[in-house]
Every structure is written in C-alpha cells, then in structure tokens.
Amino acid sequence: MKSIVFVALFGLALLAVVCSASEDAHKELLKEVVRAMVVDKTDAVQAEERECRWYLGGCSQDGDCCKHLQCHSNYEWCIWDGTSSK
C-alpha cells in the first residue's frame, strides 16, 4: 500500500516537472515568434526609407527609381526599363 502511494506521488511530481518544462518551451517559442515579428517590422521600415523607388513605386523622374527602372511618364510609377545586366 505504501509503495503504491509512493509511486503515485512520484508520478504526479514527474508529471508536474514535464508540464512545467513544456510550458517553458511554449513561452520560449512565443518569444521567438514575437522577435521574428519585430525584426520583420524593422526590415519593412528600413525598406521604406531607401533612397530609390522599387517596381511600381511612385516617382517624378527617372532618377527616383532604382537601377533598371524608369519613371513612367503618364502614371508616374517606376517600371522596368528593358535592361537586365548587373
């Protein structure tokens, strides 16, 4: 009888340790996801602050657009200029 109680208590203690470790792993995973979201948002902000416009970005002259793009005269957005060399 005493051994059954001991085994049951030991099993409950082991279960508590496993659940606690699982909860810690879950919290760590949540932190990683939040970090990834913050890094993506930071990259997006930096992309908006570059000095040239990407494809279909608004422009007023060819100099506003990035390499291999030109400013479309009617719609005022950057389009491919037909070149492909590096």
From Swiss-Prot:
Output the Gene Ontology cellular-component terms: extracellular region
Q: Which domain of life is it from?
A: Eukaryota
**Cellular localization per UniProt:** Secreted
Q: What is its main location?
A: secreted
A Pfam family found in this protein is: Toxin_12
Disulfide topology: 52-66, 59-71, 65-78
Q: Which GO terms describe its molecular function?
A: ion channel inhibitor activity; toxin activity
User: Which residues lie in the propeptide?
Assistant: 22-50
Q: Which UniProt keywords apply?
A: Disulfide bond, Ion channel impairing toxin, Knottin, Secreted, Signal, Toxin
Q: Where is the signal peptide, in residue numbers?
A: 1-21
Tissue specificity field: Expressed by the venom gland.
- Which family does the UniProt entry place this protein in? Belongs to the neurotoxin 10 (Hwtx-1) family. 17 (Hntx-9) subfamily.
Q: What is known of its domains?
A: The presence of a 'disulfide through disulfide knot' structurally defines this protein as a knottin.
> What functional role does this protein have?
Ion channel inhibitor.
Stated name of the protein: Omega-theraphotoxin-Hhn1c
Starting at the broadest rank, the lineage of the source organism is: Eukaryota, Metazoa, Ecdysozoa, Arthropoda, Chelicerata
